[in-house]
Design a protein with these regions (language model features):
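ANL superfamily adenylate-forming
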Residues: 81-127, 232
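Conserved AMP-binding A3 loop
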Residues: 2-4, 131-158
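Gly/Ser/Thr-rich phosphate-binding loop
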Residues: 216-221, 230-290, 303, 310
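Conserved AMP-binding/adenylation subdomain of ANL enzymes
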Residues: 154-171, 179-218, 232-234
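ATP-dependent adenylate-forming carboxylate-activation enzymes
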Residues: 9-12, 32-33, 53-69, 80-85, ...
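Conserved AMP-binding/adenylate-forming
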Residues: 14-62
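Conserved pre-ATP/AMP-binding loop-to-beta segment of ANL
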Residues: 116-135, 142, 165-171
Length: 313
C-alpha cells in the first residue's frame, strides 16, 4: 500500500466516523485485532481530531464496563464475534453506540468508509489537544487512562527518529500488537514520520519473521520475540545482513538472550524504556556501548529521578 492510498483510506474512515455522529474531541474506543483497517482507524482519528482509545483484545466484559464508564466514548469499534456483547455494554452508557470494524459487509466501518470520498481530511488541532487515551497495565491498581497529546506524540517521535537514525530508506518489520505504546506509537510513528516502509504482520510468527528479516533494516520486539527467534536454526548473521538495528522493550531481557542473539545474528540488541504516560523515556545509544541489563540514558529533553518507596531521591 502506498502513502497516498494510506491517506485516502484514513480520510474515508474519518468521514465514516463523521457520519456516525463522532465530533472532534469525542472518544473512539477500539478493541479490534491488528489489521490494516485498524491502522486506518487510528490515523483517521488523528487526522480528524477524535481521541483514539485502544484496548487490549483480551479484556473481558468486567474490564470493558470500567473503560466505557471512564472514557465516556461516543463510539466503540469492535469485532464481529464481540459485537453483541459490546452492544449490551454500551446500551448502559450515555450517547454511545457500537460498530464492527470489518466482517459485516454493508454495515461495518470498512463498508461505510468505502462509500465516502478519498479527498484528504486534515482538521486543525492544537498541540495540547488529547490525541490518544491509552490505559495503563494496572499493576498497582485499577487501570488508568493516560491522556497523550498531539505534542507528546510529535516530540517523542522526533527524538526517536533522530536517536535511532530512521530515514525513508528504512523498512521496519512490525509484528507488535497495536493496543499499547510500543506497537501503536513507537513502531508506527518512526516509520510514518520519515516516509519509511513497513512489513506489517498481524501477529508474531517465527517462520514469517525469518522469511521477512532479509527485507528489513529495523525490527522492534519484546524479549520473547528474540528468544523464539533463537529457537530457529535459520537465524544467522547472513540472514540478518541487511538489518541495521534490533530494538527491544516492554519487558527486561535476560543477559543470556542478549549474548546468544549477538552470537547468532551479529547484532547487539538496543534496549529502551518507556511508559504509557510518557512514551519513550530512555534508550541505549545507537553508537557506542549498549549495556546488557540496562535501558540506557534519558532521551533529550527528558529528566529522570530515582526515588524509593517514599518518593525520596
Amino acid at each position: 500500500i502506498l502513502y497516498r492510498e494510506l491517506d485516502q483510506h484514513a480520510s474515508r474512515y474519518a468521514l465514516a466516523l463523521d457520519a456516525l455522529g463522532v465530533c472532534p474531541g469525542d472518544r473512539v474506543i477500539a478493541q479490534v485485532d491488528k489489521s490494516l483497517p485498524s491502522l486506518f482507524l487510528y490515523l483517521a482519528c488523528l487526522k480528524a481530531g477524535y481521541i483514539f482509545v485502544p484496548l487490549n483484545t483480551a479484556y473481558k466484559s468486567k474490564e470493558l464496563t470500567h473503560f466505557i464508564a471512564d472514557a465516556e466514548p461516543k463510539l466503540f469499534v469492535t469485532s464481529c464475534d464481540r459485537y453483541d456483547e459490546v452492544s449490551e455494554l454500551v446500551m448502559a452508557a450515555n450517547d454511545c453506540s457500537a460498530v464492527i470494524l470489518v466482517g459485516d459487509p454493508g454495515r461495518d466501518l470498512l463498508g461505510l468508509a468505502a462509500g465516502h470520498s478519498s479527498s484528504s481530511v486534515v482538521r486543525s488541532v492544537k498541540s495540547d489537544d488529547v490525541a490518544v487515551i491509552i490505559y495503563t497495565s494496572g499493576t498497582t491498581g485499577r487501570s488508568k487512562g493516560a491522556m497523550v497529546t498531539h505534542h507528546n506524540l510529535v516530540s517523542n517521535v522526533k527524538v526517536l527518529t533522530s536517536l535511532w537514525r530512521f530515514s525513508e530508506h528504512d523498512t521496519l518489520l512490525h509484528a507488535l500488537p497495536v493496543f499499547h505504546v510500543h506497537g501503536l506509537f513507537v513502531a508506527n510513528h518512526c516509520v510514518l514520520s520519515v516516509g519509511a516502509s513497513m512489513l506489517w504482520l498481524e501477529r508474531f510468527d517465527v517462520d514469517a519473521i525469518i522469511d521477512l528479516i532479509p527485507e528489513a533494516t529495523v525490527m522492534m520486539g519484546v524479549p520473547t520475540f528474540y528468544t523464539r527467534l533463537l529457537s530457529n536454526e535459520k537465524l544467522t548473521t547472513e540472514l540478518c545482513r541487511n538489518v541495521r538495528l534490533f530494538i527491544s522493550g516492554s519487558a527486561p531481557m535476560l543477559s543470556e538472550t542478549h549474548e546468544l542473539f549477538e552470537q547468532r545474528s551479529g547484532h547487539r540488541i538496543l534496549e529502551r524504556y518507556g511508559m504509557s504516560e510518557a512514551g519513550m523515556i530512555t534508550s541505549n545509544p545507537y553508537d557506542g556501548e549498549r549495556k546488557v541489563g540496562t535501558v540506557g540514558m534519558p532521551l533529550p529533553s527528558v529528566s529522570v529521578r530515582i526515588v524509593d518507596d517514599f518518593d525520596i531521591s
